A protein has these predicted regions:
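Short S/T/G/P-rich N-terminal loop/turn motif that feeds into the first structured element of a domain
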Residues: 1-50, 56-70, 76-94
């Protein structure tokens, strides 16, 4: 069963989000992070962001969580306010 790591951030301005978007497009996930997909949602007026990382296995999730939890604050979109693990119960793309 796939798993999702859902992270909320505050203090994410438009400029920082544009910078993160550029870094994600040009780079690779951090070493040890084996995601199948990353979705980033941004509310520029509230300066909040929600990041959803999808993992195929529990081991991939565990390793990714360890790496991402240890990241320096400057490598994240803003101030991390929560991290929650979810089972991916259903998924559809069109």
């Amino acid at each position: 069963m796939a798993l999702a790591r859902v992270v909320t951030f505050e203090g994410v301005g438009k400029d920082r989000m544009a910078e993160m978007d550029r870094e994600m497009r040009e780079g690779q996930p951090p070493e040890g992070v084996q995601t199948t997909e990353i979705v980033v949602l941004h509310d520029p007026e509230a300066e909040r962001s929600l990041v959803i990382l999808f993992f195929e296995t529990e081991d991939d999730y565990r390793r990714g969580d360890e790496v991402l939890s240890a990241m320096p604050a400057g490598d994240t979109p803003g101030r991390r306010t929560s991290v929650t693990k979810y089972d991916v119960a259903a998924r559809m793309t069109t």
